[in-house]
Design a protein with these regions (language model features):
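Transmembrane alpha-helices of multi-pass, membrane-embedded glycan-processing enzymes
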Residues: 65-69, 106, 110, 163, ...
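Loop-centered beta-sheet repeat module
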Residues: 132-180
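Membrane-cytosol interface segments of multi-pass membrane proteins
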Residues: 1-152, 184-197, 240, 244-250
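Short, aromatic-rich membrane-interface segments at the entry and exit
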Residues: 28-31, 127-130, 163-164, 215-223
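Residue-level recognition of alpha-helix termini/interfacial anchor residues
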Residues: 4, 11, 167, 177-184, ...
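Alpha-helical transmembrane segments of multi-pass integral membrane proteins
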Residues: 35, 80, 84, 91, ...
Length: 255
């Protein structure tokens, strides 16, 4: 069940890997899609973790066990070959615990907590996930209006914390898809396809414009919203493809 998860995860891995190939491709602009791939991963986290049945300590401990051992292996290797350096206890805490050298881990470990709280509240109150999405959007826009430096384009810089709003929103969209999965039909419609290409074009055109035209940096708040919508649009196509049996037939051919 949910074979689309594996295919969507593969797409995310390809996009993220490709984003690190700026020095390999003939043109650095070809190394795109990293943030798109990150948001897909967060979408999948929200989708797969929808059913919360454990107490928070047990649930969070399971997340730690799934995330940190791989990090520790990588950290030990990188420190051993001196690709990384650590001087003092705080440097080792940075490498092995938080925030680590990988923005994804520091973000996901914080957002797991927020996601758990939201799901618990939702289960007890029956409030639609859409309202939580709207609340996240409202907080994001409010903080952007008063706290964000609008003089330069940096809204999706993984070195800053602004990207966590779209990561959290992607998780909630994933949870919403899990909640509504059985209601999604198998027919891929023209609006589904057109919507995907329009959002993809808007997203990449927006990134190019913000990167090259300094005067439009004040409108950068729109880009993360388009990004989350694009992830949702992508998921619609993948879920419907799964329900049409596309992935099952493809897997059979591969085997």
């Amino acid at each position: 069940m949910f074979q689309f998860v594996y295919w969507l995860r593969a797409l995310a891995a390809i996009l993220i890997t490709n984003s690190h190939y700026a020095d390999i491709w003939p043109a650095s602009a070809m190394a795109f899609g990293g943030h798109y791939g990150n948001c897909i991963y967060f979408f999948l986290s929200g989708f797969c973790l929808y059913n919360i049945g454990k107490s928070f300590p047990k649930w969070y401990a399971k997340r730690i066990v799934r995330v940190y051992p791989a990090l520790w292996i990588v950290a030990v290797v990188n420190l051993a070959v001196k690709f990384w350096s650590a001087d003092g206890i705080m440097a080792y805490i940075h490498c092995f615990i938080y925030p680590t050298w990988y923005h994804f881990i520091s973000s996901i470990m914080i957002l797991y907590l927020i996601y758990y709280i939201i799901r618990v509240i939702q289960k007890k109150t029956g409030i639609s996930l859409l309202w939580f999405l709207i609340a996240v959007l409202a907080v994001y826009l409010l903080m952007y209006a008063f706290l964000c430096d609008k003089s330069r384009y940096h809204i999706d810089d993984v070195g800053e914390h602004w990207c966590r709003f779209q990561f959290l929103a992607s998780m909630l969209v994933g949870a919403y898809f899990r909640e509504r999965y059985d209601r999604i039909g198998a027919k891929i419609t023209v609006p589904d396809i057109v919507g995907f290409f329009v959002l993809a074009a808007a997203y990449f055109a927006g990134k190019i414009a913000l990167s090259r035209i300094h005067e439009v940096s004040g409108f950068q708040f729109i880009l993360p919203i388009i990004q989350v919508l694009l992830v949702g649009s992508t998921a619609v196509l993948f879920v419907k493809a799964e329900k049409k049996g596309v992935f099952e037939r493809t897997s059979a051919l591969i085997r």
